[in-house]
């Protein structure tokens, strides 16, 4: 796992905090933040209409943050989601989403694996 410098980590945490506020306005209930497994981390786990949403938050100013979600990152997320579900509720319906924060604006991309 890569270690982030404090400034980068603080920026990421701030983006995640803002993302939670945005998601709440869309009717999401925050379940958990920064869930870790041996495979990686899920930034936000939220519930909406009975579906768990595993949300990767990416922020950036001088580039399109969606490109930071690589196929390798998705594989790690899926393994981490399996760990979460095995511990909490293996029968939950779920989807994987990305929340892009760029220049103070939010864009929620749902079901990014399809």
Swiss-Prot record:
Q: Which domain of life is it from?
A: Bacteria
A GO molecular-function annotation: nucleic acid binding
Q: Which Pfam families match?
A: UPF0102
Note the InterPro entries from the entry: Restrct_endonuc-II-like, tRNA_endonuc-like_dom_sf, UPF0102_YraN-like
The family annotation for this protein states: Belongs to the UPF0102 family.
Name recorded for this polypeptide: UPF0102 protein jhp_0762
Name the species this protein comes from.
Answer: Helicobacter pylori (strain J99 / ATCC 700824)
What is the phylogenetic placement of the source species in the record?
Bacteria, Pseudomonadati, Campylobacterota, Epsilonproteobacteria, Campylobacterales
């Amino acid at each position: 796992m890569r270690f982030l410098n404090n400034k980068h980590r603080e920026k990421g945490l701030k983006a995640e905090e803002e993302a939670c506020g945005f998601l709440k306005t869309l009717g999401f209930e925050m379940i958990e933040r920064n869930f870790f497994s041996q495979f990686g981390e899920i930034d936000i786990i939220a519930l909406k209409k009975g579906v768990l949403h595993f949300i990767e938050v990416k922020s950036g100013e001088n580039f399109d943050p969606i490109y930071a979600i690589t196929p390798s990152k998705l594989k790690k997320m899926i393994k981490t989601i399996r760990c979460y579900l095995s511990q909490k509720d293996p029968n939950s319906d779920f989807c994987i989403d990305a929340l892009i924060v760029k220049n103070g604006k939010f864009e929620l991309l749902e079901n990014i694996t399809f």
